[in-house]
């Protein structure tokens, strides 16, 4: 969340900057003035409460003197009873106003970085750069690694490898359910192990995150819309927890309430998080319904960085470069796009997506999101850095950044389409050592059902 002082000019804030940021996000601009008005009301109530406390404390002393001098204090005691009730009512009013004020501030997004394209249409996302293997003339309906026609979709390749079973998965857990089988298991695990080793070699500290979070901490790291569209709730009596949608959520809270007093020595910290992740995908009905590209349960390797504010943009570029290096090692064509202001989540000041090429579907699809959340998360989680010097108006908070390295099911889908041949799948060289027998090639063992996706597409063309 933003600092309330940023809304108040007398506190050194710049409410107009917040208004412009909200406008860029296509979000409520009016809420800024509502917050300013509510803040003034809260300050007034807080002042009245302070004055009442002073009056109450003086009355306490006067009563004490009456008792000490063995004088009648009945009048003062009656006044104390009256003030006690007033104090109770005013305290409740102040607490409610403070709660309502913070709730509104929490709805305001991070300040959009000046370099972000202002638009509410993702068609206007900025194309930052593209990459493809040197021996690939251009992306198209050809598997980029094998040079063979991409005649099958990723889920069909898995079916022909006997690598997954969607029918029994749906029977057991419902929509988008699946089992990995045989080499489907090994390929997914290979991506997990390769991703962990890849970032560990760059100095990242591996963390295997818990897959459930308590409501209090989840509410400090996830925005309200995610509770409705993404998160699964787990209830045990009165104990309420949420399944994580990404390891970013528990890792962002890993240092909650902590203070890095010597940031030049202690920061930056680079974490590589590994976890199973769970998403309801309530807002994605019917989207990417094929295979394991968009499912309710998946594994993900995540980058998470905690740094001094002065170095966060340097770390942002470094994180996306590591994700690029990872996909270059897998020889998957991709492009980097800067997400427009209206599509940013509340915490992100700027976000890059890495979209990789799927030759059967003839389109780029998102595999990576890399965000600089500046101090938006750390302020809510109270993760501070440095010693507050005399004259400083504000406490100094760390900056938090996150980036996917690989949501392994999605990355596997892209590998399947780009490494296919007529007879099977070439195994990416960097993954072979993580698979039993270190195979170079996996032959098809199953035929496709007559109503498969590619069969339907061929009928349409004919």
Swiss-Prot record:
The enzyme's E.C. designation: 6.1.1.11
UniProtKB keywords: Aminoacyl-tRNA synthetase, ATP-binding, Cytoplasm, Isopeptide bond, Ligase, Nucleotide-binding, Protein biosynthesis, Ubl conjugation
Residues reported to bind ATP: 279-281, 295, 366-369
Residues the record lists as Cysteine persulfide modifications: 373, 400
Cross-link (Glycyl lysine isopeptide (Lys-Gly) (interchain with G-Cter in URM1)): 241, 350-351
One MF annotation (Gene Ontology) recorded for this entry: sequence-specific mRNA binding
Post-translational modification summary for this protein: Conjugated to URM1, a ubiquitin-like protein, in response to oxidative stresses. The attachment of URM1 to lysine residues exclusively depends on the presence of a peroxidatic cysteine in the target protein, with low specificity for the particular residue, motif, or structural context at which urmylation can occur. The URM1-conjugation reaction is mechanistically and directly coupled to the process of cysteine persulfidation, transfering the sulfur atom of the URM1 thiocarboxyl group to redox-active cysteine residues in the target protein if it is exposed to oxidative conditions.
Subcellular location(s) of the protein: Cytoplasm, Cytosol
Top-level taxon in the UniProt lineage: Eukaryota
Gene Ontology CC annotations of this record: cytoplasm; cytoplasmic stress granule; cytosol
GO BP: any one term: positive regulation of tRNA methylation
Catalyses which reaction(s): tRNA(Ser) + L-serine + ATP = L-seryl-tRNA(Ser) + AMP + diphosphate + H(+)
Entry binding sites for L-serine: 246-248, 302, 404
Stored Pfam families: Seryl_tRNA_N (PF02403), tRNA-synt_2b (PF00587)
Top-level EC class as recorded in UniProt: ligase
Family: Belongs to the class-II aminoacyl-tRNA synthetase family. Type-1 seryl-tRNA synthetase subfamily.
Its biological purpose: Catalyzes the attachment of serine to tRNA(Ser) in a two-step reaction: serine is first activated by ATP to form Ser-AMP and then transferred to the acceptor end of tRNA(Ser).
Record comment regarding domains: Consists of two distinct domains, a catalytic core and a N-terminal extension that is involved in tRNA binding.
Protein known as: Serine--tRNA ligase, cytoplasmic
Gene of this entry: SES1
């Amino acid at each position: 969340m933003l600092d309330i002082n940023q809304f108040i000019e007398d506190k050194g804030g710049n409410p107009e900057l917040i208004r412009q940021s909200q406008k860029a996000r296509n979000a409520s601009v009016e809420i800024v003035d509502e917050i300013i008005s509510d803040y003034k009301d809260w300050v007034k109530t807080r002042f009245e409460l302070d004055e009442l406390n002073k009056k109450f404390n003086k009355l306490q002393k006067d009563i004490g003197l009456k008792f000490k001098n063995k004088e009648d204090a009945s009048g003062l005691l009656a006044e104390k009873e009256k003030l006690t009730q007033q104090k109770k009512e005013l305290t409740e009013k102040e607490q409610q106003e403070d709660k309502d004020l913070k709730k509104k501030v929490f709805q305001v997004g991070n300040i959009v970085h000046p370099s972000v394209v202002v638009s509410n249409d993702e068609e206007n996302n900025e194309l930052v750069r593209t990459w493809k293997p040197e021996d690939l003339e251009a992306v198209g309906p050809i598997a980029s690694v094998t040079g063979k026609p991409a005649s099958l979709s990723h889920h069909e390749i898995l079916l022909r490898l006997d690598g997954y079973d969607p029918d029994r998965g749906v029977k057991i857990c419902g929509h988008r359910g699946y089992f990995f089988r045989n080499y489907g298991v090994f390929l997914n695990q290979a991506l997990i192990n390769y991703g962990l080793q890849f970032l560990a070699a760059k100095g990242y500290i591996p963390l295997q995150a818990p897959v459930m979070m308590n409501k209090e901490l989840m509410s400090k790291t996830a925005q309200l819309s995610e509770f409705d569209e993404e998160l699964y709730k787990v209830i045990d009596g009165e104990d309420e927890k949420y399944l994580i949608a990404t390891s970013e959520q528990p890792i962002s809270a890993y240092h909650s309430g902590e203070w890095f007093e010597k940031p030049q020595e202690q920061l930056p910290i680079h974490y590589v998080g590994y976890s199973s992740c769970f998403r309801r995908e309530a807002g994605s009905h019917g989207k990417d319904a094929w295979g394991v590209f968009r499912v309710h349960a998946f594994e993900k390797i995540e980058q998470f960085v905690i740094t001094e504010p002065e170095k966060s943009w340097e770390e942002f570029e470094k994180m996306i470069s590591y994700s690029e290096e990872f996909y270059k090692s897998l020889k998957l064509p991709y492009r980097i796009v800067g997400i427009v202001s209206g599509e940013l989540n509340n915490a992100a000041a700027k976000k890059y997506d890495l979209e990789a090429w799927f030759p059967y579907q003839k389109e780029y699809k998102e595999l990576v999101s890399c965000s600089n959340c500046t101090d938006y998360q750390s302020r809510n989680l109270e993760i501070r850095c440095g010693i507050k010097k005399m004259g400083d108006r504000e406490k100094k908070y760390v900056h938090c950044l996150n980036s996917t390295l690989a949501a392994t099911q999605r990355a596997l889908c892209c590998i399947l389409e780009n490494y296919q041949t007529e007879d099977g799948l070439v195994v990416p060289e960097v993954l072979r050592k993580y698979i039993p027998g270190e195979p170079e090639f996996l032959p098809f063992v199953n035929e496709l059902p007559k109503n498969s996706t590619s069969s339907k597409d061929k009928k349409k063309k004919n």
